[in-house]
Swiss-Prot record:
It holds the Pfam family GCV_H. The gene is gcvH. GO terms for cellular component: cytosol; glycine cleavage complex. Its cofactor is (R)-lipoate. Keywords: Lipoyl. The glycine cleavage system is composed of four proteins: P, T, L and H. HAMAP family: GcvH. This is Glycine cleavage system H protein. Residues 21-103 form the Lipoyl-binding domain. Belongs to the GcvH family. The keyword Protein biosynthesis does not apply. The modification N6-lipoyllysine is found at residue 62.
Length: 126
């Protein structure tokens, strides 16, 4: 797993793209809990999202799970590949399985996210 990722308690990951945008997806742990992903309900470009509120839905053979935005901002890109290949969320959650890119309203929100090493330690304790 990449060390530059940050996480939420609800198992979303965030990559700071360094240009005022972040890429968001669900963690390897989350996709493992969900099982085989069969559908991803993507947000729309230009949708406004609020930190902690649902903005996407991932359906698996076991369950449907809301995906919560880790940050407040505007959707600038969605991963349309997931419409035809939702299994990428399982196969490469941190690479081709990303869900959306968000233009940050407030970059200081990134400071409240969980560093990758702390996140991994919290999983070990479960």
């Amino acid at each position: 797993m990449e060390k530059d990722l940050k996480f939420t308690a609800s198992h979303e990951w965030v990559r700071d793209n360094g240009d005022g945008t972040v890429t968001v997806g669900i963690s390897d742990h989350a996709q493992g809990l969900l099982g085989d992903v069969v559908f991803v309900d993507l947000p729309d470009v230009d949708d406004e999202v609020t930190a902690g509120e649902g903005f996407s839905l991932v359906e698996s053979v076991k369950a449907a799970s809301d995906i919560y935005s880790p940050v407040t901002g505007v959707i600038v890109e969605i991963n349309e590949e997931l419409e035809d290949s939702p299994e990428q969320v399982n196969e490469e959650p941190y690479e081709s399985g990303w869900i959306a890119r968000i233009k940050l309203s407030d970059s200081s929100e990134l400071e409240s996210l969980i560093p990758s090493d702390t996140y991994l330690e919290s999983l070990d304790e479960e």
